[in-house]
Structure formats: C-alpha cells, structure tokens
Amino acid sequence: MKRIKSGDEVIVIAGKSKGHIGKVLRVIDDAVVVEGGNLIKKHIKPNPQKPENKGGIIAREAPLHVSNVAHYNPVTKKADKVGFKYLESNGVSKKVRYYKSNNEIIDRI
C-alpha cells in the first residue's frame, strides 16, 4: 500500500509551488501530479489532422517527486505524516492509512 494515492489532498513542501494545496490527479512510480501545482508552459504545434488541436502555448501540470509533497491534514491544517495500522471488522483485518498527529483514519473502511 502506498502512502500517497490518487484523490489524496497534499501540500507541496519544496520547489517553485511550495505551499500549494491540491488533489493528486495521478501517481507515476515515485512522482505525483498535483492539481494546479508545478504548472509548466507546453508549446504545441498545430495539427491539421486533429481539428481540436489548434496549437499554441498551453499551461499544464508537471509531475513532482513524492519527497516534495506531504499529506495535508484538514483538521490541523498542516502537513502530516502517514502511518499504517490494521483494523479488524467482522473478523477480517484490513490495512488502513492514518494521520500520525491525531490518529484520524484516511481510508474508508
């Protein structure tokens, strides 16, 4: 189980987007794409075969390394560490993620 998954709310702790809070759009190996974070300008050449591609300069999100983001705890409104523990329900134990500062569970059971 990974510490950061798609849909998690994270805060950027290093880089040009430091302090930005956003949702993780996708996870790529050891990098994450954060909504509205680490914006780059991409130059697109016009393509006559695709009418929707008119070309120009487009702003889009670039991946950030996992070490440059941390989970954002909405209760404490700060970056937080994530731990793992096993919870038992109906005789079946399940591994869940939780915030270490206040023991609040991140995953749904």
Swiss-Prot record:
CDD domains referenced in this protein's UniProt entry, alphabetically: KOW_RPL26
Protein name per its UniProtKB record: Large ribosomal subunit protein uL24
Protein purpose: One of two assembly initiator proteins, it binds directly to the 5'-end of the 23S rRNA, where it nucleates assembly of the 50S subunit. One of the proteins that surrounds the polypeptide exit tunnel on the outside of the subunit.
GO molecular function annotation: rRNA binding; structural constituent of ribosome
Organism name: Legionella pneumophila subsp. pneumophila (strain Philadelphia 1 / ATCC 33152 / DSM 7513)
Superkingdom, taxonomy of origin: Bacteria
Quaternary structure (record): Part of the 50S ribosomal subunit.
GO term, biological process aspect, one: translation
Keywords noted in UniProt: Ribonucleoprotein, Ribosomal protein, RNA-binding, rRNA-binding
Protein family (similarity comment): Belongs to the universal ribosomal protein uL24 family.
GO cellular component: ribonucleoprotein complex; ribosome
PANTHER family xref list: MITOCHONDRIAL RIBOSOMAL PROTEIN L24
Listed InterPro entries: KOW, Rib_uL2_dom2, Ribosomal_uL24, Ribosomal_uL24_CS, Ribosomal_uL24_KOW, Translation_prot_SH3-like_sf
